[in-house]
């Protein structure tokens, strides 16, 4: 009973103080002050006293206030606002004159619309404070909410509680200043970021056996068939809408909402190579595949189911041994990310170092061939993909690449090499590998902070330009200087940290080397494209075996146009506007012609290379970057020629 009355006292007094603060704020905003403000304060003081007397009498006490004797461990119970004082986030509504020590202190309140921010620990494992703090509506407050511990509401037998209030004055703080502070707080670069699992992700066991995985694809095929029949029936009964647009998702009855849900649900359940292929398609623009199918694969990219605890622990015990947890102080059993091949868990080493543990789904490495075959059969059956988009030789390349991505020991070695190559880089960094917690199916690295680039569209134009500029420079260095490239341009493989103003590079499973015999010719093709030299592009393309020289005119023109479009960005000293140039869309419009008339498959190296280059250009396009590119290529070309001369 005592605890309930104590909480009631605090709430009642707090409401009175909030009312006073609101009244004073509106009076000051309207330019009214003086006697009205003093009267409001007197009224508030009287109300607080009467509430204290009334509730004290209910308890059978004559004293207005006593101490709470509760001890929450001293200063650990302090509240903090997430906005600095200087930004005007904490407002003191006490009078300008010397405070009356007998009157209750005023309540500091964040000047913002709606409730104050909820508690957020400064790190994933930092204590949030005493019990109940995380649900407090007060948010964080720097300084004491009450200037004197004796001013806290209390009654005999209650526990002592400490609150804190910022006593800094707000003299001269205008509504404009407060609005600027509010806008500064809202900017993406000023927020703390922590990666979390998609709200669509569910805990579902990964089907391990090939028969179990085949059953899921078989169920998907049957479901798509029935869904398509239902959609055809709907179309026959439904006319076009008044605007003249089609009443269904697209021309294919297989692309209904119900079928989209079936595809997403199946791929997120089986994961592995099938989900990886869907994620690869998700980073293409709408000119490459049906825009409705692109939306399906975008949902696939953003959400994957995660393993049940028992299945995940079995993988860890098999790979790291039964005592792997002895090396950790903490292990978060629910993952904070789930992808196509594995899921990522937060952990803390004995020394306090926070790490990310990527755990591979069981059975995905052994089922690559069957998964790819099953998914392609389903997609081809439903006519969802452009004809000839995945010829047999490309499928073979994808199988080999996916097998390499399942080798976490190889990925760890690639990450170490990239970390050495970019050591001391002012903008990029590669998280360190934690060798003692790595195995063929477990990869552990230091934890990085930030957010993926698909969430960077709200950043300033200057920051977006800098991010994209550095990504393109890195692409050129990877190919022409390192001869070693991370070829997966997935948004989530680039994490921007606004506090450090750096980009962390993640996921090196798709890394591959490029021989100098390949890059010697390829850089000459880009050189000719930047110079708009169509004949040299043709000659070098034949030398590289892109063309045989016997292609029909329409095929040759499509190939040359695609190369020249790629070189447009490097052709001019003027800023190149990626947001309006539609480089990837122009190239993708030529793909159907090349698929139909190509006589020989392109060099195997170009599949991953063009995926990386096209994905990097697409990042620049999505972020609407605008900067000159000619100088970066000229520098890369000059340095390459110097290294050639020295060999």
From Swiss-Prot:
Report the EC number(s), separated by commas if there are several: 2.7.-.-
Q: Which residues bind ATP?
A: 340, 358, 445-448, 493, 507
Outcome when changing residue 279 to R/H? Does not affect selectivity for binding ADP or ATP
| Pathway the protein acts in | Cofactor biosynthesis; ubiquinone biosynthesis
Q: What outcome follows a substitution of residue 611 to A/Q?
A: Does not affect selectivity for binding ADP or ATP
Tell me the segments the record calls region Disordered: 90-117, 182-203
Q: Which residues does the Swiss-Prot or TrEMBL record annotate as the active site?
A: 488 (proton acceptor)
Q: Name one GO cellular component term.
A: extrinsic component of mitochondrial inner membrane
Q: Motif KxGQ motif: where?
A: 276-279
Q: Where in the cell is it found?
A: Mitochondrion membrane
Q: Where is the Protein kinase domain?
A: 329-518
Q: Transferase as a keyword? A: yes
Tell me, in one coarse class, where this protein mainly resides. Answer: mitochondrion
Name one matching Pfam family. Answer: ABC1
Query: What effect on the protein does mutating residue 221 to L have, as reported in its record?
Result: Slightly impaired homodimerization
Where does the entry say this protein is expressed, by tissue? Widely expressed, with highest levels in adrenal gland, heart, pancreas, nasal mucosa, stomach, uterus and skeletal muscle.
Please name the PANTHER family in this protein's record: ATYPICAL KINASE COQ8A, MITOCHONDRIAL, PTHR43851
Domain note:
Adopts an atypical protein kinase-like fold: while it adopts a core fold similar to that of well-characterized protein kinase-like domains, a number of features are positioned to inhibit the kinase activity: (1) an atypical AAAS motif in an alanine-rich (A-rich) loop that replaces the canonical glycine-rich (G-rich) nucleotide-binding loop and limits ATP binding by establishing an unusual selectivity for ADP and (2) an N-terminal domain, containing the KxGQ motif, that completely occludes the typical substrate binding pocket.
The record's disease note says: Coenzyme Q10 deficiency, primary, 4: An autosomal recessive disorder characterized by childhood-onset of cerebellar ataxia and exercise intolerance. Patient manifest gait ataxia and cerebellar atrophy with slow progression. Additional features include brisk tendon reflexes and Hoffmann sign, variable psychomotor retardation and variable seizures.
What does this protein do, in the record's words?
Atypical kinase involved in the biosynthesis of coenzyme Q, also named ubiquinone, an essential lipid-soluble electron transporter for aerobic cellular respiration. Its substrate specificity is still unclear: may act as a protein kinase that mediates phosphorylation of COQ3. According to other reports, acts as a small molecule kinase, possibly a lipid kinase that phosphorylates a prenyl lipid in the ubiquinone biosynthesis pathway, as suggested by its ability to bind coenzyme Q lipid intermediates. However, the small molecule kinase activity was not confirmed by another publication.
Name this polypeptide is given: Atypical kinase COQ8A, mitochondrial
| Organism whose genome encodes this protein | Homo sapiens (Human)
